[in-house]
UniProtKB/Swiss-Prot annotation:
<dbReference type="GO" id="GO:0004550">
    <property type="term" value="F:nucleoside diphosphate kinase activity"/>
</dbReference>
<dbReference type="GO" id="GO:0006228">
    <property type="term" value="P:UTP biosynthetic process"/>
</dbReference>
<dbReference type="GO" id="GO:0006183">
    <property type="term" value="P:GTP biosynthetic process"/>
</dbReference>
<keyword id="KW-0418">Kinase</keyword>
<feature type="binding site">
    <location>
        <position position="59"/>
    </location>
    <ligand>
        <name>ATP</name>
    </ligand>
</feature>
<feature type="binding site">
    <location>
        <position position="93"/>
    </location>
    <ligand>
        <name>ATP</name>
    </ligand>
</feature>
<dbReference type="GO" id="GO:0006241">
    <property type="term" value="P:CTP biosynthetic process"/>
</dbReference>
<feature type="binding site">
    <location>
        <position position="114"/>
    </location>
    <ligand>
        <name>ATP</name>
    </ligand>
</feature>
<dbReference type="InterPro" id="IPR034907">
    <property type="entry name" value="NDK-like_dom"/>
</dbReference>
<dbReference type="InterPro" id="IPR036850">
    <property type="entry name" value="NDK-like_dom_sf"/>
</dbReference>
<comment type="subunit">
    <text>Homotetramer.</text>
</comment>
<keyword id="KW-0597">Phosphoprotein</keyword>
<protein>
    <recommendedName>
        <fullName>Nucleoside diphosphate kinase</fullName>
        <ecNumber>2.7.4.6</ecNumber>
    </recommendedName>
</protein>
<keyword id="KW-0479">Metal-binding</keyword>
<dbReference type="GO" id="GO:0005524">
    <property type="term" value="F:ATP binding"/>
</dbReference>
<dbReference type="Pfam" id="PF00334">
    <property type="entry name" value="NDK"/>
</dbReference>
<keyword id="KW-0546">Nucleotide metabolism</keyword>
Amino acid sequence: MALERTFSIIKPDAVAKNVIGAIYNRFESAGLRIVASKMLHLSKEQAEGFYAEHSERPFFGALVEFMTSGPVMVQVLEGENAVLKNREIMGATNPAEALAGTLRADYAASIDENACHGSDAPESAAREIAYFFSDEEICPRTR
């Protein structure tokens, strides 16, 4: 088993539903440790930069608008196989296809407002973590 870090966003729809604590509980109950966290209201530029890989997709404008519509929580999670574990906790991108008990099944209303984001690979996790956090902001949890 590999100790990994992954990146997670609790999106504006889930923040508005006041389920941040419930989501953090899911992370911790699954063995993931929160090693960095902050609430932000993304600027248009931040959202466009973060989702740049989707800039040519038809949903890009709506995605940026949604991600800037209210505050988000960004966090770094650490644990054994953290990337895969977080993706399992989140569930399918489309909440209609997400398994019961996953974050998206429980808290998302649609594929467009789907409650959370999680890195899809260790490489994207490293890039996404660096986008929002400096090394000094990450607090390894040794106890």
